[in-house]
Amino acid sequence: NQSERAEDSGNESDGDKDELSTLVEMGHHAPWDIDDM
């Protein structure tokens, strides 16, 4: 997945957060998001 790749890169862009918001909005909370926090 593109978002996973971006996260693996180390949160290079703020756009990742935006994508995350979209995922959460859809109801797909990514587990790696919590781990990153």
From Swiss-Prot:
Residues 1-37 are annotated as: Disordered. Ion channel activity is inhibited by hexamethylene amiloride in vitro. Pfam families: Vpu (PF00558). The modification Phosphoserine is found at residues 9, 13. Coiled coil: none annotated. Residues 26-37 have a biased composition (Basic and acidic residues). GO terms for cellular component: host cell membrane; membrane. It is found in: Host membrane. Keywords: AIDS, Apoptosis, Host membrane, Host-virus interaction, Ion channel, Ion transport, Membrane, Phosphoprotein, Transmembrane, Transport. The keyword Phosphoprotein applies. Homopentamer. Interacts with host CD4 and BRTC; these interactions induce proteasomal degradation of CD4. Interacts with host BST2; this interaction leads to the degradation of host BST2. Interacts with host FBXW11. Interacts with host AP1M1; this interaction plays a role in the mistrafficking and subsequent degradation of host BST2. Interacts with host RANBP2; this interaction allows Vpu to down-regulate host BLM sumoylation. Enhances virion budding, by targeting human CD4 and Tetherin/BST2 to proteasome degradation. Degradation of CD4 prevents any unwanted premature interactions between viral Env and its receptor human CD4 in the endoplasmic reticulum. Degradation of antiretroviral protein Tetherin/BST2 is important for virion budding, as BST2 tethers new viral particles to the host cell membrane. Mechanistically, Vpu bridges either CD4 or BST2 to BTRC, a substrate recognition subunit of the Skp1/Cullin/F-box protein E3 ubiquitin ligase, induces their ubiquitination and subsequent proteasomal degradation. This is Protein Vpu. It comes from Human immunodeficiency virus type 1 group M subtype D (isolate Z84). The gene is vpu.
